[in-house]
Every structure is written in structure tokens, then in C-alpha cells.
């Protein structure tokens, strides 16, 4: 089965047709999924003098597709012929009339790509960086398949805190620092400003393992966490798995034999009653154990399987 590819770093206004057209140059696509950005209304009932890092009264509620959000509107540029005097223009702005709708964002910043065959997947993964709509994007194996087969240790934790507008390093260290020493907190930004996720680096990879089993809430919002793994680490883990599979093919299981095992042990009609003397029994090495005590061979060739047994 061809692996699914996770693409991140897409522009907010990139369309599904653009993403599909770009990746079709590597091979025939089976699937192209471009999730739309989530749309929320923000309600803040707290006092204005309260610090934003300590606010707990901010609520986020999803809106209908037909509703228009504040960040999807822009003020019309002042035009004397259209708006008259500047005072009338400002009055219209106050009444909510002098606004125009901006193009709605079509992308949440990531996509899932699946090719029909492995050739398209291999061609796409040859390059770490791809450019779509003048935005540099990264591609990697999708998480669900990557975690099932590979166990890659990492001290870095990916944290998405959407729909919160922003978080501080102090808040993150306060909530995540209880699980291990934090050495660095890196906030990610693009040309439009800071994004809603960051990378937390711990001193020990075991801290990341523990956090992946926990549910962390900040300001009543559940943090989305995943292991931040470099592509080089994934390749090393895949190489180790291939080496292990190759060793398993070469290594024979215990008591391996090329002969059929008889339904009952081979016994000798000349079995000796003396159990103290042990002699080499080639049939035991061929999978015929357990055997009763056998007398020594008179023909040395029969011990190596070149002649008939004497019993």
C-alpha cells in the first residue's frame, strides 16, 4: 500500500486544485485532501486591564459558513467622489457600511496527498522542500502510518494551540515543564505573522513520550501535541527496520531442519540399557530428537549422512 504524505506550510489562500496540479507532476494521485481553516467567533468577557497571558474568560465558538468574521472584512479606501467629506466617511465606518469582503481563506495550512503507486511517492519524497503558490512547504510521511511502523526518539514536541491567538513561553513552560526540563521554545511564523503552533525542546526524549499520553489544557483549550521528528531520523529508523528484516530472513529458527519430522521418535532395536555413555547422534541435529540412546556407529560415513544407518 502506498503511504500517505503530509504537506505543511501551505499558503492560507491556496486552493485544492492548485495543490492537486502541483503534485500530479510526480505521479497519478489517488487522493488530495485540503482541510479548510476552522472559523471561530471570539468572545472576551474579561476586564480590559487583565493581562492576556492570564485571561480565562475568552471563549471560541464555531460559526456558520455563511457568517462573515471580522478578519474577513476590510475598510474601503477613502474616495472623495464616493464618500463625500471625510466626516461622512468615518460615520459610515462606525455604522458598519464602508467595509468590503476580502477573499476567504481556503487552506488550514496543510494537506494530505496519496499517490496511486509507489513511483509517485518516491519521486515526491526526493525533495524536502516544495514551493506552492510562492510558499515553501515540507513533505513527510503521514503520522498514522509513520507511528505504526517506526519508533523514532525525539526531544522535540510539536504543540498546536489553535484557536488561541497567542501563548507565551512562560505559559508553555508552566504547563509542560512539569514533565521534564525544557531547553527551548520556538514559535513558528510566516510572512503573515505568527502561526498557532510552536516547537518545545526537552532535555530528555522520555519527557516527550510521557506527554504524548497526556491531555494538556491551557485556558480551557486542549493542546494538540505530536512528536516532532526530523526526516533524517525517519530514514535512519527505516534503514534499521530493513536491516532487522534482512537478519530475520537469514537467521534460521531454533531446531530448524530441512527434513520432515516423523510422527514418533526413531528408536533402536539395539538400544543399550546404559544411560551413562553419551554418543554423537546425527539424527538429533536433523530434528529427530528426542531419541533413545543409540550405539556408536561402525561406519563413520553414516554419521555424516553418506551411508545407511547400522540400526
Curated annotation (Swiss-Prot):
**Which superkingdom is the protein from?**
Eukaryota
Query: Which is an annotated GO molecular function term of this record?
Result: RNA binding
Kindly list the GO CC terms recorded for this protein: catalytic step 2 spliceosome
Q: Where is the composition biased (Polar residues)?
A: 261-270
Claim: RNA-binding is one of the keywords in the record: yes
Q: Which InterPro entries match?
A: Nucleotide-bd_a/b_plait_sf, RBD_domain_sf, RRM_dom
- What name does this protein carry? Putative RNA-binding protein R05D3.8
Amino acid at each position: 500500500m502506498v503511504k500517505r504524505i503530509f504537506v505543511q506550510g501551505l499558503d492560507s489562500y491556496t486552493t485544492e486544485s492548485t495543490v492537486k496540479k502541483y503534485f500530479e507532476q510526480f505521479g497519478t494521485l489517488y487522493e488530495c485532501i485540503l482541510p479548510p481553516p476552522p472559523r471561530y467567533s471570539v468572545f472576551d468577557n474579561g476586564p480590559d486591564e487583565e493581562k492576556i497571558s492570564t485571561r480565562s474568560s475568552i471563549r471560541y465558538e464555531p460559526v456558520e459558513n455563511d457568517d462573515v468574521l471580522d478578519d474577513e472584512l476590510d475598510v474601503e479606501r477613502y474616495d472623495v467622489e464616493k464618500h463625500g467629506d471625510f466626516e461622512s466617511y468615518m460615520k459610515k465606518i462606525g455604522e458598519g457600511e464602508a467595509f468590503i469582503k476580502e477573499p476567504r481563506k481556503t487552506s488550514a495550512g496543510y494537506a494530505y496527498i496519496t499517490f496511486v503507486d509507489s513511483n509517485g511517492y518516491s519521486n515526491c519524497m526526493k525533495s524536502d522542500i516544495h514551493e506552492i503558490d510562492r510558499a515553501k512547504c515540507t513533505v513527510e510521511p503521514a503520522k498514522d502510518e509513520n507511528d505504526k511502523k517506526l519508533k523514532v526518539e525525539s526531544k522535540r514536541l510539536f504543540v498546536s494551540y489553535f484557536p488561541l491567538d497567542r501563548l507565551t513561553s512562560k505559559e508553555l513552560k508552566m504547563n509542560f515543564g512539569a514533565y521534564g526540563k525544557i531547553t527551548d521554545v520556538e514559535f513558528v511564523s510566516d510572512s503573515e505573522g505568527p502561526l498557532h503552533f510552536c516547537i518545545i525542546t526537552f532535555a530528555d526524549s522520555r519527557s516527550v513520550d510521557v506527554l504524548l499520553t497526556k491531555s494538556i489544557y491551557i485556558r480551557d483549550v486542549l493542546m494538540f501535541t505530536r512528536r516532532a521528528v526530523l526526516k533524517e531520523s525517519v530514514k535512519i529508523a527505516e534503514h534499521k527496520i530493513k536491516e532487522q528484516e534482512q537478519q530475520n530472513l537469514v537467521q534460521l529458527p531454533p531446531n530448524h531442519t530441512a527434513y520432515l519430522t516423523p510422527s514418533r521418535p526413531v528408536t533402536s532395536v539395539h538400544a543399550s540399557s546404559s544411560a551413562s555413555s553419551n554418543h554423537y547422534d546425527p539424527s538429533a541435529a536433523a530434528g529427530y530428537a528426542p531419541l533413545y540412546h543409540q550405539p556408536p556407529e561402525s561406519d563413520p560415513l553414516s554419521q555424516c549422512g553418506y551411508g545407511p544407518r547400522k540400526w
